[in-house]
């Protein structure tokens, strides 16, 4: 199941986002994960990877998009937020 979560007005360094995405992607049951700022270019990359859901498509350039494809994405989305805190 594909799930996106948008955190409005949250900006993070791309290196930090890649580290969290790698940890989320390594979880059991997670097929793929990405965390990106909601710029048009980043949303295009998410779409090409098959990770852009309607919620993520509505993200603005100052928003964080957390994208997860997993059997149960809720736990992965929540862990991503905790790791960024």
Each model region followed by its residue ranges:
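Non-catalytic terminal accessory/regulatory regions of metabolic enzymes
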Residues: 1-85
């Amino acid at each position: 199941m594909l799930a996106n979560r948008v955190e409005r007005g949250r900006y993070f360094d791309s290196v930090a986002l890649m580290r969290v995405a790698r940890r989320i992607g390594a979880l059991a049951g997670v097929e793929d994960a990405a965390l990106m700022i909601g710029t048009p270019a980043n949303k295009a990359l998410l779409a090409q990877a098959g990770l852009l859901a309607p919620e993520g498509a509505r993200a603005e350039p100052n928003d964080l998009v957390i994208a997860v494809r997993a059997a149960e994405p809720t736990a992965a989305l929540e862990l991503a937020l905790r790791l960024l805190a």
